[in-house]
Amino acid sequence: QEPVAESGLGEDGHPARGGFLPPADNRNRMWAGGRVEFLRPLEAGGEARRVSTIKHIEEKQGRTGALLFVTVQHDYLQDSRLAIREEQDIVYREPTPPKTSSGEPMVAGGWREAVTPTPTLLFRYSAVTFNGHRIHYDWPYVTETEGYAGLVVHGPLIATLNLRAFCRANPDARLRRFAYRGLRPLIAPQPFEVGGRIVAPGKAELWAGDHNGLAQKAEVEFD
């Protein structure tokens, strides 16, 4: 995300709401999922430009209360040509106990990789993505204020590890589209697995989870 001065941050470590993102009262922020479309390669060393827009805002009523869904679109251009289009789904929810199980068991078959999400890994990912959300590194805040059992693994980090596992298992694949959806949080340092399987020519299903079941589902389209 864009760098923001300390004075421009909210209590949770994110940029204060009401600027680019809409105000959302005192609700907690969660990353619900996203989609990435790879249209053409970005040239290393070349100048690129990102254009960000709010594509969709929707209020829903869930089992835990009111939910505000926001979809942000990022277009990455080089030489005035669109190279990558990313959509991020963000949800703001009322403070409620986080889910500990999705009710969906882990999937068998295909490739699998074990992951141990250390606090250092979470901190480094927060740093490289300029993500100040305190649920990823501030133990007192995440456990006492937001009610999680420990540090929360970033949804995009899980997606990144899932995509890396896919590329390792399919080194000749050329990515076209990637989509993922969060089902529940993963808590560090509890180990989890990422994995997947080819379900059709040019298409794979990916997943991530632990002994409590699935935490994220994803799909890849490739050549």
Describe every region a protein language model picked out.
Residues 1, 33, 39, 45, ...:
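Surface-exposed loop/turn and secondary-structure junction residues enriched for glycine/proline
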Residues 1, 78-79, 90-153, 167:
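Catalytic strand-loop segment that frames the active site of acyl-thioester-processing enzymes
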Residues 1-47:
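Hydrophobic, proline/glycine-rich low-complexity stretches
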Residues 6, 17-18, 26-28, 33-35, ...:
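Generic secondary-structure boundary/loop-capping signal
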Residues 13-19, 39-42, 51, 116-117, ...:
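Generic detector of short, locally flexible boundary/turn motifs and exposed helical patches
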Residues 17-24, 100-104, 164-168:
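Intrinsically disordered, low-complexity boundary segments flanking structured domains
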Residues 31-117, 186-189, 193-223:
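HotDog/MaoC-like acyl-thioester-processing domains
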Residues 142-201, 205-219:
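Catalytic-pocket segment enriched in acidic/His residues
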